[in-house]
């Protein structure tokens, strides 16, 4: 199945996830207390960044997951929810978060697509069953506005994800290397 692309509707999902927040601050008697359900149903006007990594307990993946947490307030300021997903189960996510210093306090849920339905529907499921390293920016109408898939050895750049989100939310023509606050392209003025 080909990767869903710009203009396609993002598939509906309901996934079990490890709750956001500092795991040390959560009062829980058992691992299940650390789990929640995340879905594609979001408040009106909300954008989403849904990013996938191939596998827990690897090397590049935790650097990306932590990096997506760093600009959390920037995403919130843009009315954008962030959800991280892999095909590992929620117990594996929980164990990884507990054991990795940079993952213990994440401001977004780590979701499990254990049955691989979402991964497959998006066209990012590998023959080995893992998800590709993929990022989707989804507008408030549930339409994919940006897709990026990178090699396992290459981590993503969250500043670039924010830049793309700014450009998409500007609803203007934005030149290469455009940054929020910079002038956009006046196509009508150029056609003159």
List the model feature ranges, each with a label.
Residues 1-192:
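Chalcogenol-based redox active-site neighborhoods
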């Amino acid at each position: 199945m080909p990767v869903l692309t710009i203009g396609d509707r993002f598939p509906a999902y309901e996934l079990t996830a490890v709750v956001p927040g500092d795991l040390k601050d959560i009062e829980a008697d058992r691992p299940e207390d650390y789990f929640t359900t995340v879905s594609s149903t979001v408040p009106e006007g909300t954008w989403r960044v849904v990013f996938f990594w191939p596998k827990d307990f690897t090397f590049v993946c935790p650097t990306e997951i932590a990096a997506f947490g760093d600009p959390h307030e920037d995403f919130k300021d843009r009315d954008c929810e962030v959800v991280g997903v892999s095909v590992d189960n929620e117990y594996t996510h929980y164990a990884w978060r507990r054991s990795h210093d940079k993952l213990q306090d994440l401001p977004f849920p780590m979701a499990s697509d254990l049955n691989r339905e979402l991964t497959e529907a998006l066209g990012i499921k590998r023959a080995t069953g893992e998800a590709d390293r993929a990022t989707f920016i989804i507008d408030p109408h549930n339409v994919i506005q940006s897709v990026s898939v990178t090699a396992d050895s290459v981590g993503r750049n969250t500043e670039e994800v924010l830049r793309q989100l700014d450009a998409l939310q500007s609803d203007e023509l934005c030149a290469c290397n455009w940054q929020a606050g910079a002038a956009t392209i006046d196509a009508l003025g150029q056609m003159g």
